[in-house]
Swiss-Prot record:
Keyword Chloroplast: yes
Protein's recorded name: ATP synthase subunit b, chloroplastic
Cellular component terms per the entry's GO annotation: chloroplast thylakoid membrane; proton-transporting ATP synthase complex
Membrane-protein topology: Single-pass membrane protein
Organism: Huperzia lucidula
InterPro entries per the UniProt record, alphabetical: ATP_synth_b/b'su_bac/chlpt
Amino acid sequence: MKNVIDFVIISGYWPPAGGFGLNANLLETNLINSGVVLGLPVYSGKGVLSNLLNNRKQTILSTIRDAEERYEEATDKLKQARTRLQQAKIKADEIRINGLSRMEGEKQDLVDSADGNSKRLEDSKNATIRFEEQRAIEQVRQQVSRLALERALEVLNIRLNSELQSRMIDYHIDLLVRAAENTTD
């Protein structure tokens, strides 16, 4: 209980520190000192801050100009690259068209050559067939002639006797005499 009494006595001397408020005494608040402490660096640092800001501004402007120049260069290079790409596409199309034309020409040449070879082979085959036909015909003629001569000789040998031979000789001699007389007249 003594503690409670001591607490009541002490609280009577000091006011309780439980709230906040506005102190209207300027000297106690040290507002002027704070203003001087804060204002002096602002006033004296104004030039330095201005120089820093100007330097930063110049750096930013320089960076922007460099970026714009690089952008222009990149744009020019892009245009040049597009032009080269277009030229390359045109050249590739020309090469492709020339290749196709050459391929068609060579294909046609091969077809023509094959047709020519086929025609030559056909002509050679036909000539060989004609030659073989002629040879066969000639062999048949020779055999027919030989057989005809053999048959005629057989018939003559059978029919030809000495009397017929004499008459034939006389007949042919008479023909020769008349022919000789006609030529001398």
